[in-house]
Curated annotation (Swiss-Prot):
NCBIfam families: MIP (TIGR00861), PRK05420.1 (NF003838). The record marks F43, H172, T181, R187 as: Selectivity filter. This is Aquaporin Z. A motif (NPA 1) lies at residues 63-65.
Amino acid sequence: MLNKLSAEFFGTFWLVFGGCGSAILAAAFPELGIGFLGVALAFGLTVLTMAYAVGGISGGHFNPAVSLSLTVAGRLPAKDLIPYWVAQVLGAIATAAILYVIASGKDGFSAGGLASNGYGELSPGGYSMMAGLLIEIILTAFFIIIILGSTSSLAPAGFAPIAIGFGLTLIHLVSIPVTNTSVNPARSTGVALFADTAALSQLWLFWVAPLVGAVIGAIIWKGLLGRD
């Protein structure tokens, strides 16, 4: 079990470091930097690369919503769910702390949102709580369908990380303006703890919505689409 939890810790670490790190350190440097497209691609690439690296050890979840969906779908034992969540959240917190230290090394540093998620005044585009709730539920549900479908016995072998990585990239392209894109409670928790905003007070949405979306996605796949 230790090797599985270690894989989830380091996999989540890499996801947050590559994804949130690109947003914090590179999105606006120099001037335009890598922008939304670059950040979206960074999140997708982190999942793709680490899924190939450690997916064979733990399943490559790196996300409490994914772990919940796999439990609902019967692919992850219920007894493993909470340990997976703990490893994922700790990995995200460790990464956020390191990113904070790195970012603070720049003159005139201000933590600001630190790539955290939010709605209302904390939404990049000023979107409401309801808009944030809906988009996070819908996109998480489809992310789960992509994951369950691409890793099923019906799909071509060996290509799942590519589909999942591109799926996460597309999700970010759609929703960065709305919530700064979560679909991952661990990712949201890590950076919220170090943000110099009210991100922590809005964190509930980025647990509730992805977990609800995960259950919906798993039910859709298991009940209507999948045969495995």
